Amino acid sequence: MATRAVARRKSAAGETSGSATSVRANGGELADRDLVGMYLDEIARTPLLDAAKEVELSQTIEAGVFARQVLEGYEETGADATREELQALIDESERAKDVFIRSNLRLVVAVARRYPRSGLPLLDLIQEGNAGLVRAVEKFDYRKGFKFSTYATWWIRQAITRSIADQSRTIRLPVHLVEELGRIRRVQREFNREHGREPEPAEIAAELGSTPERVTDVLDWARDPVSLNMSVDDEGETQFGDLLEDTSAVSPEQSVLTLLRSEELDDLIGRLDPRTASIIKMRYGIDDGRERTLTEVGKEHGLTRERIRQIEKHALLELKKLARDTGFEAAA
């Protein structure tokens, strides 16, 4: 849903990116650090939200979404509220969304800083992460009792890692191939919008007056050869291969750590042994909203990264089993 709040956020992010590009040409990495410092000073002026305020803002946003739906079908629904009243709810919703976003911009910076070797400037990662934050605010369901910071981290990380995966080409194509690739991409987008699926090479070729073999060749040439073992995070734990989409992965709402209401999750984790419970809480930021790396958790418990990974995997399976046995999963 396109909103004025989103537009303002994208506009602000674009201005930051444009300024960064200009200054980088003259000051390089030092200028980037200066811009990040200025940005942090600016966003630090907005206070953080407590859980009650998050719920209040979410309710206001939800009311605005409903009001927009009513307003769009105003003549058919015969709504009791006037157009002016509905528009007032929409405007208030946009203001609430803007406050929600601004109050969590520091979370985006914290996540973006985990990828210093991604090949992208920190400001660019922050800009992509901000888009993920906007998505999180729009999708957040306060009724499930989750901490917003934990929920939003998933969306922020998704936006950033996808940006890393789409980073600048390592192989430069000739201009005529770039133009041909652009035409192919345009047909792909239009076909997908019209038919709801990706076109086959033969369907693209028919539209462009080309051959399926030529379309396949151009798409193959356009692929970037990137090492799957390339490290992209500060601790060296995340490799490029880890960023590739898992088509079998569940959405954040379906995850075992977000499906359950917070009080039920606390109850389930309390059934694990103390060490395992502590590891799960640290890994997923359940107590303070800050997710720890395998290395950090390992140091805290005097265990290796691999051992922490094994304990975490076993614990998640145990939590799923407990959720089924207790009926929490069905109630979520």
Curated annotation (Swiss-Prot):
| Subunit and partners | Interacts transiently with the RNA polymerase catalytic core.
**PANTHER family, alphabetized:** RNA POLYMERASE PRINCIPAL SIGMA FACTOR HRDA, RNA POLYMERASE SIGMA FACTOR RPO
Origin organism is Streptomyces coelicolor (strain ATCC BAA-471 / A3(2) / M145)
Cross-referenced Pfam families? Sigma70_r1_2, Sigma70_r2, Sigma70_r3, Sigma70_r4
Which example biological process does GO assign this protein?
DNA-templated transcription initiation
Q: What is this protein called?
A: RNA polymerase principal sigma factor HrdD
Q: Give the protein family.
A: Belongs to the sigma-70 factor family.
Composition bias type Low complexity, residue spans: 13-22
